[in-house]
Each structure stands twice: as C-alpha cells, then as structure tokens.
Amino acid sequence: MRIISGTLKGKKLYKPKDLLTRPLKDLTKESIFNIITHSNKFSIALEGANILDLFSGTGSFGLECLSRASKHVTFVENYKKILPILKKNIADLNCEKKSQVIEKDINNSSSFKIIQNQFDIIFLDPPYKEKKLLEMLENIFQSNLLKDKGIIIIHRHKKEVDEFPEKFNIIEEKSYGISKVIFGNYI
C-alpha cells in the first residue's frame, strides 16, 4: 500500500495485520483519482480542496489527496486498533499540519455536529456490512457538510444493495473486483 502520485509518490503506508480492516486497494484508489481528475461529469479540483475522509482506516484516501495538493483532510475513525496506524501514517508523511483526526463513531446524527467545515470531497468507506449508509448520507446533507459543487465518493461491496436519499444524485458507478465505487452529489 503506497501513495500513487503527487509530492509523496511512492511513500509506503502502514496497514493493519488484522483481517477486520479492509484498506483501499491501490488499483481502486488509482481509478478513483483518475475519475476525479478526468471526468467530464463533474468538475472538482484536488488542488486546494477540503476533504472529509469518513471511516478513514489507514488514511490512504486522504493522504493521497494531500499528496496531490489538497488543502486539508479531516479524518474520522473510531476503530481503536487502526487509530495508531492512521496517526503514524499521517506523522510519517509530515501531514499533521494539513490534517485533523476525529476519533468518533459517526453512526448517528449528533456525531456529525462536531464536524464544522464544508468539504469539496467526502469519501465514505464504511465496513462492507454497514447498513446505515442511507442514514449517513442524510446526516451529511442535514449537516450541510458538502459544498455546492462538491462530490461524495462511496466505496462499498459490489453486492450491497443500498438505499439513497431522494436528493442524492448518482453521477457515476464503477466496479473493481468485489467492490464498487459510487460518485454522487446532492441536487
């Protein structure tokens, strides 16, 4: 697991040894960033962007954003076994000044209130069996976390059948092995 592009290109990231954590695979991550950079379906620039990385895990997505000149990443993670790895990856890449780690479970509406900013990109990578995606997307909308032209990127198991809020617009969906990635926004 590594940083694919940008100022930190080639830097290795620590990953957990347990099987409960499912780090974002390099091929999937590279495809996501190719879509962000080259899609004509939405217009978002990584340079100078504010990023919210929910269920951050090792921080692979957010750190890739920082490597590609994003302004700031807010990492949200509550799994106690992965938090030291997330913090080590941030420190080893000297990204502490451009990041914030929130150690919080975000499975209810009140937990979203501690997040004070608006974001250009919100990345959700919940555990594959997580059933509260609809509720999380509604909380993101109600908390006004996404900027007007921002996008939400969701990484899920491809067999998951998810419900989406009425105001959520799926822009693009791609499959990679056993996972799928959904790009969307609010209309």
Model-inferred region functions:
Residues 1-187:
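Class I S-adenosyl-L-methionine-dependent methyltransferase catalytic core
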